[in-house]
Swiss-Prot record:
Its main location: cytoplasm. This is UDP-N-acetylglucosamine 1-carboxyvinyltransferase. Phosphoenolpyruvate binds at K22, N23. The modification 2-(S-cysteinyl)pyruvic acid O-phosphothioketal is found at C116. Its EC number is 2.5.1.7. The active site is at C116 (proton donor). InterPro entries: Enolpyruvate_Tfrase_dom (IPR001986), Enolpyruvate_Tfrase_sf (IPR036968), MurA_subfamily (IPR050068), RNA3'P_cycl/enolpyr_Trfase_a/b (IPR013792), UDP_GlcNAc_COvinyl_MurA (IPR005750). The gene is murA. Keywords: Cell cycle, Cell division, Cell shape, Cell wall biogenesis/degradation, Cytoplasm, Peptidoglycan synthesis, Pyruvate, Transferase. It comes from Herminiimonas arsenicoxydans. One of its GO terms (molecular function) is UDP-N-acetylglucosamine 1-carboxyvinyltransferase activity.
C-alpha cells in the first residue's frame, strides 16, 4: 500500500495547475446516461473516484473514450440499469446514476452507498424526491429498486440541503413530464456546473445558482461539449499549505469566484492574496494567525476545507475554534495531528486548537479524503520526517498531489 514520505520545513515557491473539480466531474459523468448522443468533456481530473465512476458507467453499457483530461461518453448502448454493491461501496457518488437511469429508462437498481467513513449521509432525500415525482421505490437486500413509466413534475422541498440529492433530482427532472420545482436546493458551484451542462444538452432550467430550481421537462436531451470547473477544494488545500509553510505560489487554471470565504480566512491568517480571472497568487512570510470558523452549506465555509484550515491553525499564533455542523464524524484527523505535536481538544461538534511553536514529524494514518490532505499540510510544516499511511484516500480526490507539491519545492515522495 502506498505511503507518502515528507521532510518538513521547506518553503514553497513556483506554480501549480489546478485540476477539474471531483465533485463536479462525478455528476457530470452520470449525465452521460441522459442521452443517446455523445457528450464531450474536458478538464476531467485524474482521480480514483473518476476511474471508479467510469468503470461503473462502462459496466452499464456507456461507451467511453479517454485522452488525457478529455472524456467522450456515448449513451446509445446503455443496457444494464444497475449499480452493484462492489462499485458503490467504494464511492457513495455512485448514487448519482439513480436519477438519470430512472428518468431515461424507467427503472434503476442501485446499491445503498458507502464512501468515506465520515458519518451516515442518508439517501432518504433522493428517495422522497423521486417518490414525489411518481416513482415506485422499494429497498430490499441493500438495494434501492426504482420504477416509473415516466416521471411527473412535482414541487419538492428537501428537509436538508443535500448536494448529491439536488443533483440526482435535477437530472431526474430534466426528462420528466411537466414542471419540477426544487426548493432548498444546494447552491454549490458544482451543482451550477452540472446545471449549465444540462442546459447545453437541451434542458430547461431556471434559477441556476439559487436555492430554487425550476425545471421544465423535455422529451429528450442531445449531446454537448463542456469543460469541468476548477476544483475549489484542491485550490484551498494548496493555499492552506503555503499559509502553513510559507512561500510564494501561483495557482493556474483556478476559479476565484467560488472561494470568497476561504480568501477571507486566509487573509485573516496573514496571507497576501492577489488574483486574476484564472490565477491566484498566495504569499506568506510569517507565522499564520489562528482563525476560527464554522462549516456550513455554500456560500458558507465548506466542510471539505475544515481539516486543511485546522492544519494551518495547529502551528498558528493564538487559539481557534472550529465548529463542524455538516458531518457528525469529521474530526478523525485530530488524533493524528496531535501525534505530530498539535494541541487540539474536541468538545462535541467543536475542536479547540491551541497553536504550537512547532510540529514534529511522526508516522500517521489518513482516515478519509480531506483528513489525508490536512496531514500532508501538517507534515510540510513539521520539523523532520512524517510518513503518512493509507493515502489511497488522498488519491480518491487529489490529482497527483505529491507531484504538484514537489514542483514547488516540497520534499515529498510516494513510497511503498
Amino acid at each position: 500500500m502506498d505511503k507518502l514520505l515528507i521532510q518538513g520545513g521547506h518553503r514553497l515557491s513556483g506554480e501549480i495547475a489546478i485540476s477539474g473539480a471531483k465533485n463536479a466531474a462525478l455528476p457530470i459523468l452520470c449525465a452521460g446516461l441522459l442521452t443517446a448522443d455523445a457528450l464531450q468533456l474536458s478538464n476531467v481530473p485524474h482521480l480514483q473516484d473518476v476511474a471508479t465512476m467510469l468503470k461503473l458507467l462502462r459496466q452499464m453499457g456507456l461507451q467511453i473514450e479517454q485522452d488525457g483530461d478529455q472524456v467522450t461518453l456515448n449513451g446509445s448502448g446503455v443496457d444494464k440499469l444497475e449499480a452493484p454493491y462492489e462499485m458503490v461501496k467504494t464511492m457513495r457518488a455512485s448514487i448519482l446514476v439513480l436519477g438519470p437511469l430512472l428518468t431515461r429508462f424507467g427503472e434503476a437498481r442501485v446499491s445503498l452507498p458507502g464512501g468515506c467513513a465520515i458519518g451516515t449521509r442518508p439517501v432518504d432525500q433522493h428517495i422522497k424526491g423521486l417518490q414525489a415525482m411518481g416513482a415506485e421505490i422499494t429497498i430490499e437486500a441493500g438495494y434501492i429498486h426504482a420504477k416509473a413509466k415516466r416521471l411527473k413534475g412535482a414541487r419538492i422541498v428537501t428537509d436538508m440541503i443535500t448536494v448529491t440529492g439536488t443533483e440526482n433530482l435535477l437530472m431526474a427532472a430534466v426528462l420528466a413530464d411537466g414542471e419540477t420545482i426544487l426548493e432548498n436546493a444546494a447552491r454549490e458551484p458544482e451543482v451550477t456546473d452540472l446545471a449549465n451542462l444540462l442546459v447545453a444538452m437541451g434542458a430547461q432550467i431556471a434559477g441556476i445558482g439559487t436555492d430554487r430550481l425550476v425545471i421544465q421537462g423535455v422529451e429528450r436531451l442531445h449531446g454537448a461539449s463542456h469543460a469541468v470547473i476548477a476544483d475549489r477544494i484542491e485550490t484551498a488545500t494548496f493555499l492552506c499549505a503555503v499559509a502553513a509553510v510559507g512561500g510564494d505560489v501561483t495557482l493556474r487554471k483556478a476559479r476565484t469566484d467560488t472561494l470568497d470565504v476561504a480568501f477571507d480566512k486566509l487573509r485573516e491568517a496573514g496571507a497576501i492574496l492577489t488574483a486574476g480571472d484564472d490565477w491566484i497568487r498566495v504569499q506568506m512570510s510569517s507565522r499564520p494567525k489562528a482563525v476560527s470558523f464554522r462549516t456550513t452549506e455554500y456560500p458558507g465555509f465548506p466542510t471539505d476545507m475544515q481539516a486543511q484550515f485546522m492544519a494551518m491553525n495547529c502551528i498558528a499564533e493564538g487559539s481557534s475554534q472550529v465548529v463542524e455542523t455538516i458531518f457528525e464524524n469529521r474530526f478523525m484527523h485530530v488524533q493524528e495531528m496531535n501525534r505530530l505535536g498539535a494541541a487540539i481538544t474536541i468538545e462535541g461538534h467543536t475542536a479547540i486548537v491551541n497553536g504550537v511553536d512547532k510540529l514534529v514529524g511522526a508516522p500517521v494514518m489518513a482516515t478519509d479524503l480531506r483528513a489525508s490532505a490536512s496531514l500532508v499540510i501538517a507534515a510540510l510544516a513539521a520539523e523532520g520526517e512524517t510518513l503518512i499511511d493509507r493515502i489511497y484516500h488522498l488519491d480518491r480526490g487529489y490529482d497527483r498531489m505529491e507531484v504538484k507539491l514537489s514542483a514547488v519545492g516540497a520534499h515529498i515522495q510516494r513510497v511503498k
